[in-house]
Curated annotation (Swiss-Prot):
Keyword Cell membrane listed: yes
Domain ABC transporter: 2-247
Record's protein name: Methionine import ATP-binding protein MetN
SUPFAM superfamilies named among the record's database cross-references: ACT-like, P-loop containing nucleoside triphosphate hydrolases
Family in the record: Belongs to the ABC transporter superfamily. Methionine importer (TC 3.A.1.24) family.
Membrane topology: Peripheral membrane protein
InterPro entries noted in UniProt: AAA+_ATPase, ABC_transporter-like_ATP-bd, ABC_transporter-like_CS, ACT-like_dom_sf, MetN_ABC, MetN_ABC_transporter-like, NIL_domain, P-loop_NTPase
EC number: 7.4.2.11
Length: 347
């Protein structure tokens, strides 16, 4: 549904050049919720603004619903009209609500339809339908100043859906909201994704957002995507930075003659008592140093850091047993004080 190829964006100011996007390749499948995560300055917002050509890429291509938007970004009037038509099928929700304070909630939702030349009666019908969809039917005649932050964002979402988009872009839509309101907005986005078949591309710096609703995710650093895939694929990738960030675990070995192992489990393996089976099978005492578990995409997933007695060479067979159960295993290198992962699972 969304594909970028070799996407580059260079900003020029006062003789200086800043590369915000450096050859970004991204593929978002139809009907999925895709999260792009990264620190401030990683290039996330530049990426999402290039997807609908609010920012014109320096080079590379952007394809949405099979249409090459970069090919429509010419300078002539015809190119501009075609690009506007293509953009009408892409909704966008911003961090700041950008509601017109002098208009009622219903009038704010009607604004895109008004610009498209839709008749007044049809605009009103559509706006009320969308307000019902986001749970704000009773606020149709209210003004933005009378709404909470979460309600304002719901109006922003309804407005973004006015043109019946196939794609919804969300740029840090929950970062200004409290945790409870954030959860309700994320649930709304997931519900809309399922009810309307929307493809959702969201930008965030919060791991909880990815855990809550994303089917796939990508990690951005310095204008590049350094890791991407479905959440389940990432959890099964040895040494995955995203998996470690989604489910962080800590804990150091109690002695030099101990082996510390990070165990990642998801799907059916997450419901099996594999640690107790390991202890009974090999008659060894196992210490649990830390654990993180949650439900992602309806599946129970998590990571656990355990300590086994003896050095690594003494634990090759027990570690092999864990792998046979379908678990991802990363052996933690004790020689590094920061517990750098040895990508043992890649062997």
């Amino acid at each position: 549904m969304i594909t970028t190829t070799g996407l580059t964006k260079v900003y020029r100011s006062r003789g200086r050049e800043v590369t915000a996007l450096d050859g970004v390749d991204l593929h978002v499948r139809e009907g999925e919720v895709y999260g792009v995560i990264g620190q401030s300055g990683a290039g996330k917002s530049s990426l999402i603004r290039c997807v609908n050509l609010l920012e014109r890429p320096t080079s590379g291509t952007v394809t949405v619903a099979g249409q090459d938007l970069t090919a429509l970004a010419g300078r002539g009037p015809r190119a501009g009209k075609e690009l506007r038509t293509a953009r009408s099928h892409i909704g966008m929700v911003f961090q700041h609500f950008n509601l017109l304070s002098s208009r009622t909630v219903q009038d704010n939702v009607e604004l895109p339809l008004e610009i498209l030349g839709v008749s007044g009666r049809e605009r009103g019908r559509k706006a009320l339908e969308l307000l019902d969809l986001v749970g704000l039917t009773d606020k149709a005649k209210a003004y933005p100043a009378q709404l909470s932050g979460g309600q304002k964002q719901r109006v922003g979402i309804a407005r973004a859906l006015a043109g019946d988009p196939k794609v919804l872009l969300s740029d840090e839509a929950t970062s200004a909201l409290d945790p409870e309101t954030t959860r309700s907005i994320l649930q709304l986005l997931r519900d809309l994704n399922r009810q309307l078949g929307l493809t959702v591309l969201l930008i965030t710096h919060e791991m909880n957002v990815v855990k809550s609703i994303c089917d796939s995710a990508a990690l951005m650093e310095k204008g590049r995507i350094v890791e991407s895939g479905t959440v389940s694929e990432l959890l099964g990738t040895p040494g995955s930075e995203l998996a470690s960030a989604l489910f962080p675990v800590t804990g150091d070995a109690s002695g030099d003659d101990r082996t510390v192992v990070d165990v990642t489990f998801h799907g059916e393996a997450a419901t099996q008592p594999v640690i107790s089976q390991l202890s009974r099978t090999y008659n060894i005492d196992i210490s649990i140093l830390g654990a993180a578990i949650d439900t992602v995409g309806g599946l129970q997933v998590g990571r656990m850091r355990i300590e086994l007695p003896g050095r690594y060479e003494d634990n090759v067979v027990p570690i092999g047993f864990l792998r046979e159960q379908g678990l991802q295993i990363d052996v933690v290198d004790k020689s590094d004080q920061e517990s750098v992962l040895v990508k043992e699972g890649a062997k």
